[in-house]
Amino acid sequence: MSAEAVKKLSFEIAPSEEESEATIEQQDVACGLENLPVSLWPLGAGPRPKPFQYTPDHVAGPGVDMDPTQITFPGCACIKTPCVPGTCSCLRHESNYNDNLCLRDVGSEAKYAKPVFECNVLCQCGEHCRNRVVQSGLQFLLQVFQTEKKGWGLRTLEYIPKGRFVCEYAGEVLGFSEVQRRIHLQTAHDPNYIIALREHTYNGQVMETFVDPTYIGNIGRFLNHSCEPNLLMIPVRIDSMVPKLALFAAKDILPGEELSYDYSGRFLNQISSKDKERIDCGQPRKPCYCGAQSCATFLPYDSSLYGPLENPGTS
């Protein structure tokens, strides 16, 4: 589809004259909790997403050791000078964003391993600091819409430049035992919203964060998987070590394009020998309908979440 055709689409899905302002307000999927409304398509009577409690930020769920709403990081003392590497305590390595608020070095996979820390509420720099991107919330008009095969999806109504922040993947932060419990309760027809983030530190340790927006979450829960995604998930820390799962544009995105990311956290949907053994033993894979040329034909699979249930006291 050409750029002109996509832009035309973005105008065609605007509300009709018959739609009242009250009706349009009711269609805000974000319930007024984001700084921009998130529309729903189609308007009027018809299918609607399954109800859930909206939250723009993480909330503490069962079994989690650290409350994601607590502020544990100290703030910087940049009052008279801008936050720059070398003087700002929040920027120990290099600047996270350029002058256009784009994530630096998108497209260089080696850069993804570097931690991203933003300034927080205790910092002296103020709300206009360039190191406050993810915490500023939505910057582009987005829309939840019904796809042909993938259920509900999320698309942009505006042009999004490569490197810009798009949205978070927010929900309940869970302990591992609770994650396993919820996974084991799922049927083959239930969608799985739980994401497992694993960060490997320099000393060989692995930091795990489990987020589930099934019951409490934000618009990130509507993002579908793609084997050739246009979004990249980056852990961004602001107030504490509990990371925000921030999604940035991996390339320029045109109006009307569906937003997607790789559920495996990579750009290649590969399967390990351990996962293959478990699948061969009867654990089914869900088909992938992304339509990409490199489509792996199935959704990513994390075998560690399907093991024997742990004792709740060990989470």
UniProtKB/Swiss-Prot annotation:
GO terms for biological process: cell population proliferation; DNA catabolic process; DNA double-strand break processing; DNA integration; double-strand break repair via nonhomologous end joining; methylation; mitotic DNA integrity checkpoint signaling; negative regulation of chromosome organization. Residues 74-137 form the Pre-SET domain. Zn(2+) 3 binds at C83, C119, C125, C129. InterPro entries: H3K9_Histone-Lys_N-MTase, Post-SET_dom, Pre-SET_dom, SET_dom, SET_dom_sf. Zn(2+) 2 binds at C76, C90, C119, C123. It is found in: Nucleus; Chromosome. Residues 284-300 form the Post-SET domain. Keywords: Chromatin regulator, Chromosome, Metal-binding, Methyltransferase, Nucleus, S-adenosyl-L-methionine, Transferase, Zinc. CDD domains: SET_SETMAR. Disulfide bonds: none annotated. Histone methyltransferase that methylates 'Lys-4' and 'Lys-36' of histone H3, 2 specific tags for epigenetic transcriptional activation. Specifically mediates dimethylation of H3 'Lys-36'. Belongs to the class V-like SAM-binding methyltransferase superfamily. In the pre-SET domain, Cys residues bind 3 zinc ions that are arranged in a triangular cluster; some of these Cys residues contribute to the binding of two zinc ions within the cluster. This is Histone-lysine N-methyltransferase SETMAR. It comes from Rattus norvegicus (Rat).
